């Protein structure tokens, strides 16, 4: 698999709570790649939590920092990168993401909500109707997420290991398509 990928980065996109970080770690280990979570890189670089950045700079300020981090990350190879759920919202980010293979972890709202219900660290979910907010965000982002090279549909019974296996099995078909185009 590593020889097929030739060091190309994997970028995991999808909603908050989709499992990008967990699955990303597993994929990195399987491939012998490094692993980065853009939200963690942002928090380390700014010495602030994502909530603090949202509170101080707003979503637009956070998205700019996120784009700056992604611009730097895409110059490296052999990385599996878990991105923030809204990274797809800025057109400039797509030019960075296209330096690698883009994997969409597509998770239904009910599963996302079950995973995130007790999480108070998500600024976009500080809402009177967090499930409705999730549904709205997913509807807004689905046309963008669907531009990924590979869509992995996740169901409630699947473990992170099973999802990572699904990704590993699907990657060769996408790379063959890319190579033949």
Curated annotation (Swiss-Prot):
Subcellular location: Cytoplasm
Keywords of this entry: Amino-acid biosynthesis, Aromatic amino acid biosynthesis, ATP-binding, Cytoplasm, Kinase, Magnesium, Metal-binding, Nucleotide-binding, Transferase
Binding-site residues, substrate: 39, 63, 85, 141
Principal location listed in the UniProt entry: cytoplasm
GO biological process: amino acid biosynthetic process; aromatic amino acid family biosynthetic process; chorismate biosynthetic process
Presence of keyword Kinase: yes
Co-factor requirement: Mg(2+)
First-level EC class: transferase
Record's cofactor remark: Binds 1 Mg(2+) ion per subunit.
Keyword Transcription regulation set for record: no
Reactions catalysed according to its record: shikimate + ATP = 3-phosphoshikimate + ADP + H(+)
MF-aspect GO terms: ATP binding; magnesium ion binding; shikimate kinase activity
Pathway(s) served: Metabolic intermediate biosynthesis; chorismate biosynthesis; chorismate from D-erythrose 4-phosphate and phosphoenolpyruvate: step 5/7
Recorded GO CC terms: cytosol
SUPFAM superfamilies in the cross-refs: P-loop containing nucleoside triphosphate hydrolases (SSF52540)
Residues the entry annotates as binding Mg(2+): 21
Family assignment from sequence similarity: Belongs to the shikimate kinase family.
Quaternary assembly: Monomer.
Cited function: Catalyzes the specific phosphorylation of the 3-hydroxyl group of shikimic acid using ATP as a cosubstrate.
Protein name: Shikimate kinase
Protein source organism: Nostoc sp. (strain PCC 7120 / SAG 25.82 / UTEX 2576)
